[in-house]
Amino acid sequence: QTTEILLCLSPVEVASLKEGINFFRNKSTGKDYILYKNKSRLRACKNMCKHQGGLFIKDIEDLAGRSVRCTKHNWKLDVSTMKYINPPESFCQDELVVEMDENNRLLLLELNPPNPWDLQPRSPEELAFGEVQITYLTHACMDLKLGDKRMVFDPWLIGPAFARGWWLLHEPPSDWLERLCQADLIYISHLHSDHLSYPTLKKLAGRRPDIPIYVGNTERPVFWNLNQSGVQLTNINVVPFGIWQQVDKNLRFMILMDGVHPEMDTCIIVEYKGHKILNTVDCTRPNGGRLPMKVALMMSDFAGGASGFPMTFSGGKFTEEWKAQFIKTERKKLLNYKARLVKNLQPRIYCPFAGYFVESHPSDKYIKETNTKNDPNELNNLIKKNSDVITWTPRPGATLDLGRMLKDPTDSKGIIEPPEGTKIYKDSWDFEPYLEILNAAVGDEIFLHSSWIKEYFTWAGFKDYNLVVRMIETDEDFNPFPGGYDYLVDFLDLSFPKERPQREHPYEEIHSRVDVIRHVVKNGLLWDELYIGFQTRLQRDPDIYHHLFWNHFQIKLPLTPPNWKSFLMCCEQNGPGILQFSTERTNEPNRNKFSVENKA
């Protein structure tokens, strides 16, 4: 490890430290830090939110003077414990080492391990024209020609992602399947269905089931649901983080984890003849913010909008005006963050991608109109304004010749656009086959027995948390589904009460389209299908993000689905065993009463 001095305070500055929170900036680097003093004890950290790198300021609501608030998303950090308190029970802040030197100066130190990509370094060799070519297919899918090898990133080329919420914005080149079949290896960054697309992989597996696919060794396996998917792939390789994987004498790659979501998200460095290509994909803080500088090509997401917040929320502050202003502000923050990241890393070329999706199903017209995305050209213009980085806004089928661009960025053959008349944007989507799969779950025998509710949430395994959730099945327009289920779950003791308990408790209402929620329940899928796919409408009181709850249902559900076969056998043996739910609505907001009769 190397030790880096981040900040040095003089004896006078040390003597003037006040009890509680102290903010400092290193004027030479422009970096900000927080020191917390409790009598003789000092703790310190970077003034950077772990979520998306926002700056902390004093939390005026904290009378004890121990917490700071992020200016981006209002996350709160208790600096006395270095634990985040909003969202509750979520992350811990990385602490810095505090030392006094022989001159009574206070030093803030960071211990840095060596960068794994610097091990066994290679000097860049000159590339022949056409030797390295990067072709954009759609969304996050790139086709890389690296000498005599071909590598593909994140192939989502047909069908929806996140149940039925996302559809491709760009029309993939007509030869996309041939390109996949010709690949020597495929990298899939994480398990979200706009990167791990089973409809796409099913097409590929029909012709090349043994194609080598590489994924990182995440806590939640990328292919956790492979057996249930029915897709026959026989050559999936799970590789450790931070270690070069040699493909041939000229080509190697290294997978790195995300600093915010290490349990599921990854990014990749591909190196050919010493030239690095960095693809940070969807990582919030790729590799904890430590990334190679001056790579040949960097690509990352840019668009925003990959969340149900705030479009799917209502009640309280969530007016249309508030949502519109929030979305506008957040998109601008994301643009500035990406531009700053590119400026700091100084790649020769930057490409915004992994944000080209659209909410094209007619039932999601509101989301499509509300959930505005960043314009890649606006980001590229911002980057060019502040740096000498070359930018590339890709179009389906466009090819970047890395050798040409590195030698002469003005070379007219450096980027070959698709032929004139090529269809760029999709104007039709084959909805029906995918909606039929979802609709098949609605009439499944499981849901004739309302005891499925207890069975499912017991299987899910989330409990001992003070939260009450009301789950309501709805139609396309989020009106109550005729004959659908409407019930309470108390996660403190995992009970299903008739009405909300009298104790103080946070409360959420989750309205879910019946086809998607039943498909998710039946197959034991993660709730990203619901939340990121815009298939819910939510209300919460108080307005707090319950990280433990959402993180569990979005990433920590069991790896195998509920045993519904056994469940149905028990139902047959025990008679109806059905909990009958009826809803008596009161005039009190969020105080809906339930009549529950156990007929077992």
Curated annotation (Swiss-Prot):
Cofactor note: Binds 1 [2Fe-2S] cluster per subunit.
Rieske domain residues: 9-107
Enzyme Commission numbers on file: 1.14.18.2
Keywords: 2Fe-2S, Cytoplasm, Electron transport, Iron, Iron-sulfur, Metal-binding, Oxidoreductase, Transport
A Gene Ontology term for the protein's cellular component: cytoplasm
Cofactor(s) listed in the protein's UniProt record: [2Fe-2S] cluster
Matches recorded under Pfam families: Lactamase_B_3, Rieske
Pathway per the UniProt entry: Amino-sugar metabolism; N-acetylneuraminate metabolism
Cell compartments where the protein resides: Cytoplasm
Principal location listed in the UniProt entry: cytoplasm
MF annotations from Gene Ontology: 2 iron, 2 sulfur cluster binding; CMP-N-acetylneuraminate monooxygenase activity; metal ion binding
GO biological process, one term: N-acetylneuraminate metabolic process
InterPro entries attached to this UniProt entry: CMP-Neu5Ac_hydroxylase_Rieske, Cnh, RibonucZ/Hydroxyglut_hydro, Rieske_2Fe-2S, Rieske_2Fe-2S_sf
Highest taxon listed in the record's lineage: Eukaryota
Gene3D superfamilies named in the record: Ribonuclease Z/Hydroxyacylglutathione hydrolase-like, Rieske [2Fe-2S] iron-sulphur domain
Binding site for [2Fe-2S] cluster: 49, 51, 70, 73
Reactions catalysed, as given in the entry: CMP-N-acetyl-beta-neuraminate + 2 Fe(II)-[cytochrome b5] + O2 + 2 H(+) = CMP-N-glycoloyl-beta-neuraminate + 2 Fe(III)-[cytochrome b5] + H2O
Function description: Sialic acids are components of carbohydrate chains of glycoconjugates and are involved in cell-cell recognition and cell-pathogen interactions. Catalyzes the conversion of CMP-N-acetylneuraminic acid (CMP-Neu5Ac) into its hydroxylated derivative CMP-N-glycolylneuraminic acid (CMP-Neu5Gc), a sialic acid abundantly expressed at the surface of many cells.
PANTHER family per record: CYTIDINE MONOPHOSPHATE-N-ACETYLNEURAMINIC ACID HYDROXYLASE, INACTIVE CYTIDINE MONOPHOSPHATE-N-ACETYLNEURAMINIC ACID HYDROXYLASE
Family designation: Belongs to the CMP-Neu5Ac hydroxylase family.
Protein's name according to its UniProt entry: Cytidine monophosphate-N-acetylneuraminic acid hydroxylase
Natural source organism: Pan paniscus
Gene: CMAH
